[in-house]
From Swiss-Prot:
Name of the featured protein: F-BAR domain only protein 1
Region entry Disordered, spans: 153-172, 302-347, 381-600, 813-833
UniProt-annotated stretches for the region Mediates interaction with the adaptor protein complex AP-2: 267-439
Organism: Mus musculus
Gene Ontology CC: clathrin-coated pit; cytosol; nucleoplasm; plasma membrane; postsynaptic endocytic zone
MF terms in GO: AP-2 adaptor complex binding
Keywords associated with the record: Coated pit, Coiled coil, Endocytosis, Membrane, Phosphoprotein
Bias (Polar residues): 816-827
Name of the gene: Fcho1
Organism classification: Eukaryota, Metazoa, Chordata, Craniata, Vertebrata
InterPro entries listed in its UniProt record: AH/BAR_dom_sf, F_BAR, FCH_dom, FCHO1_F-BAR, GMIP/FCHO2-like_FCH, MHD, Muniscin_C
Function: Functions in an early step of clathrin-mediated endocytosis. Has both a membrane binding/bending activity and the ability to recruit proteins essential to the formation of functional clathrin-coated pits. May regulate Bmp signaling by regulating clathrin-mediated endocytosis of Bmp receptors. Involved in the regulation of T-cell poliferation and activation. Affects TCR clustering upon receptor triggering and modulates its internalisation, playing a role in TCR-dependent T-cell activation.
Length: 873
């Protein structure tokens, strides 16, 4: 209904001005709404900081007493409330950006509308001008008519009458022209005014709809936050109820108890006889009382020692004193180890110290790596760490309590280690302090998540060209954390894993059976047919927001370890899991001698951001049939995030670390996301299909990293699988390698031809396919085999394997053929399998952006490989 077209007319024609000023108030309302949302975001941020401060206050509660475990309940609840309000702050800031963006667009729209309604402004001005002239013309006409009538009554001359009639006719004509001009201006004004009114109403309708949508987003964000807050309070109430009084008393008794054995009764006779015997022993061992050091004529204990040990009688001077032998003349004898403490005049004599360092006993010349590593650990364990920044270290005295000099200790060294520097010092330093953070993705186990107990399928990737990126500086902390023992910083030799090599397996039906994904702590976001559902008894947001402390409540606050030790295949497909694992050869490193402090530890606030790295790993499953260009394809992938080892201490210290949040872009092709419910949260209310925001549960992240650090304290980085995803790829252009196969099975001759071609459109960035292998199974005895080009034969698995060079866009096609004579009748066609890997791109095109501050992205790795890649005739 056109409200503006019906209610803004009137005699004075002020309707257009009212409508125009109403439209101009739109940007003002948008600006005021932005100010309101900004102020609400500031309030939520302040409240979040206050809750974080309250959580810190709860964490500093006294660990003594039976009430101590309940402080952990308060801390967890406060952390969750702070996280809820912080998430609302983030949503409000995003909404504020939308409001400001709309305000800019609104200004452009109003500027364009102002140019379009200029005609209406002219029509209003024209009608106003004509309306002002019309009364004047009417007054003039009335005046002329009255003059003519007055002359007629006065019987004026005809000449005067003619003049008056002429003037009256001219006034009538002028009035008629004014009326016609007014009617014309009015008609033009009515048309333009109606058009402008409709235009203004449409603008206001769009403005109000957009503003209502913004208000709906605001209300939805606040409502979601209040629902989460209600869940946190409900969980707090449940946790308090679960921690019973008996549980608190039992926990205090078990942790602070002094023992279960009660003191027994005493027998007076036995107790008194034992005391009497002890007193007699003390009396027999006592010496006569005397004041030492009053006379220099008392012989020294050291002289008595020399007399008893030396076969030469001591030299005596004229007064009867024994002369101390010169140390320089008695090199053959062992220096005295005792001195007299009975004299008060010891400090007046010059005292000489004789230090004799005995060489280490001769050992075998050969020094094994195990002995060298054990020796290095013993040496490093006796070292004292340098003081931290702003700290001081007291220098200990070289004398013991008796005043004698201590003999310096030296670590035993073998002959070969002491003769020359070892050439293996560089591998040792790498094993002690680890490679840079970015080298975490050069190993085959980067897709695993050892902290959560997830085991992924073997990765077919190998590290051929490690990137030269900056060192994170967090790989080798030189200061021990306040919690662990000093052994946590003692370097230990590691045994890094080697990159695997692709080895194909015979794709027999038994080897192509899919592996069902194991249940794990993952929350699906898709259909039940594609992703394994999570445990229905799993606790949601309430059960994962916790931080490990020295005191924990033995109640449902902590999750059972059973969920954390389950394995999950990287391919959640029910029938398309990669079942051709590569070999994993072992790798060992000879350890040498040497030690280095490594880079200085990073303290939160000493750098702009903490480094993290991510990796996208995808597996493509495809099935081709004969020479048909169509295929069935599905891609599964996972996102892995890597943290340097030193960041564990930063996360465990104070102040608490900022929340790590990130955004996945180009998510429209992905059908299902399966996030790790124990580590990350997502906003289900996001409407943009191209992006998806996630943020990490910092308490659970810290616990997972600490668990990995306990399991592997020498690791320089830790990997965590954050989420998995899958999507379908229809059409032949959706896979990187198009394949076709043709079998000709005769009674005396079998011919097989395989064709392949590279598809550059499967990925956004064309990357070569490496480690390409084509596997042709032959499950029968054959003779007269001819292969073009040459292939290798695996007797155990009964298959031919073509190892092809890298397949890229230039010349990325080829033809393979094989023929043989079957010995047991016509051959049975079997599927031909392919294997390959690719670095530098993904099939999904997903990308990751960090949100907020406190972290920086050190490296983003992208790679994909084959899962089940088959072609049948």
């Amino acid at each position: 209904m056109s409200y503006f077209g019906e209610h803004f007319w009137g005699d004075k024609n002020h309707g257009f001005e009212v409508l125009y000023h109403c439209v101009k108030q739109g940007p003002v309302a948008t600006k005021e709404l932005a100010d309101f949302i900004r102020e609400r975001a500031n309030i939520e941020e302040t409240y979040s900081k206050a809750m974080a401060k309250l959580s810190k206050l709860a964490s500093n509660g006294t660990p003594m007493g039976t009430f101590a475990p309940l402080w952990e309940v308060f801390r967890v609840s406060s952390d969750k409330l702070a996280l809820c309000h912080l998430e609302l702050t983030r949503k409000l800031h995003d909404l504020l950006k939308d409001v400001l963006r709309y305000g800019e667009e609104q200004l452009k729209t109003h500027k364009k509308c102002k140019e379009e309604v200029l005609g209406t402004v002219d029509a209003v001005q024209m009608l106003s001008g004509v309306g002002q002239l019309l009364p004047k013309s009417r007054e003039n006409y009335l005046s002329r008519c009255m003059d003519l009538e007055r002359l007629r009554r006065e019987n004026t001359s005809q000449k005067e009458m003619d003049k008056a009639e002429t003037k009256s006719k001219k006034a009538a004509d002028s009035l008629r022209r004014s009326v016609d001009k007014y009617n014309s201006a009015r008609a033009d004004f009515e048309i333009k005014m109606l058009d402008s009114a409709l235009r203004f109403q449409a603008m206001e309708e769009a403005h109000l709809q957009h503003m209502k949508a913004l208000l709906g987003s605001y209300a939805h964000s606040v409502e979601d936050t209040h629902v989460q807050i209600g869940q946190v309070h409900e969980e707090f109430k449940q946790n308090v109820e679960n921690v019973t009084v008996d549980m608190l008393l039992r926990k205090f008794a078990e942790s602070k108890g002094t023992g279960r054995e009660k003191p027994g009764p005493l027998d007076f006779d036995a107790y008194s006889s034992a005391a009497l015997q002890e007193a007699m022993k003390r009396l027999r061992g006592a010496k006569a009382f005397r004041l030492p050091g009053l006379s220099r004529r008392e012989p020294r204990a050291s002289v008595d020692f020399l007399e008893s040990d030396s076969g030469v009688p001591p030299e005596v001077d004229d007064e009867g004193f024994t002369v101390r032998p010169d140390i320089s003349q008695n090199n053959g004898a062992e220096p005295p180890r005792f001195s007299s403490s009975d004299s008060d005049f010891d400090d007046e004599e010059p005292r000489k110290f004789y230090v004799h360092i005995k060489p280490a006993p001769t050992r075998a010349v050969a020094c094994s790596s195990e002995a060298a590593a054990a020796q290095l650990r013993a040496t490093a364990g006796s070292l004292i760490l340098p003081p931290g920044p702003g700290g001081t270290m007291k220098r200990h005295s070289s004398r013991d309590t008796s005043g004698k000099p201590q003999r310096p200790r030296s670590a035993p060294r073998t002959g070969s280690c002491a003769e020359k520097p070892l050439a293996s010092e560089e591998p040792l330093s790498k094993s002690l302090f680890g490679p840079p953070l970015e080298s975490a993705f050069d190993h085959d186990d980067f897709t695993g998540s050892s902290s959560l107990g997830f085991t992924s399928s073997p990765s077919p990737f190998s590290s051929s060209s490690p990137e030269n990126v900056e060192d994170s500086g967090l790989d080798s902390p030189s200061h021990a954390a306040p919690g662990p023992s000093p052994e946590s910083w003692v370097p230990r030799p590691g045994t890094p894993q080697s990159p695997p090599t692709c080895r194909a397996q015979h794709p027999e039906p038994r080897g192509l059976m899919p592996r069902a994904p194991s249940p794990g702590p993952w929350g699906p976001e898709g259909g039940a047919d594609s992703l394994t559902p999570a445990d229905p008894t799993r606790e949601g947001l309430a059960a994962t927001l916790r931080r490990p402390r020295s005191r924990k409540v033995s109640c449902p606050l902590t999750r059972s370890n059973g969920d954390l030790c389950r394995s999950l295949s990287p391919s959640p497909l029910g029938s398309s899991a990669p079942t051709i694992p590569p070999d994993r050869p072992s790798f060992s490193t000879q350890m040498g001698h040497g030690i280095s402090r490594g880079p200085s530890p990073v303290v939160l606030g000493s750098q702009d951001a903490l480094p993290v790295a991510t990796a996208f790993t995808e597996y493509v499953h495809a099935y081709f049939r004969g020479h048909s260009p169509s295929c069935l394809a599905r891609v599964t992938g996972e996102l892995t995030m890597t943290f340097p080892a030193g960041i564990v201490r930063v996360f465990s210290g104070t102040p608490p670390p900022p929340v790590l949040s990130f955004r996945l872009v180009n998510t429209a092709p992905v059908e299902h996301f399966q996030p790790n419910a124990d580590l990350i949260f997502s906003d289900p209310s996001q409407s943009d299909p191209e992006t998806k925001d996630f943020w990490l549960n910092m308490a659970a992240l810290t616990e997972a990293l600490q668990h990995q650090a306990e399991q592997n304290p020498t690791a320089s980085y830790y990997n965590l699988v954050l989420l998995r995803y899958q999507f379908s790829r229809p059409g032949p252009e959706s896979v990187p390698l198009q394949m076709s196969a043709h079998w000709q099975c005769g009674p005396t001759l079998t011919r097989v031809s395989v064709e392949y071609s590279y598809r550059a459109g499967a990925t956004a960035v064309s990357t070569p396919l490496t480690n390409v292998q084509i596997l042709l199974p032959v499950g029968e005895p054959v003779t007269s085999v001819r292969l073009q080009p040459a292939a290798t034969w695996n007797t155990e698995e009964k298959r031919f394997t073509w190892k092809l060079p890298d397949v890229c866009e230039a010349g990325g096609s080829g033809h393979l053929s094989a023929s043989w004579q079957p010995q047991s009748g016509p051959s049975t066609p079997s599927p031909v399998a392919a294997q390959f890997t690719s670095e530098g791109a993904t099939l999904s095109g997903l990308d990751l952006e960090l949100l907020g501050g406190g972290y920086r992205m050190s490296l983003v790795k992208r790679r994909f490989a084959t899962g089940m890649y088959l072609v049948s005739c």
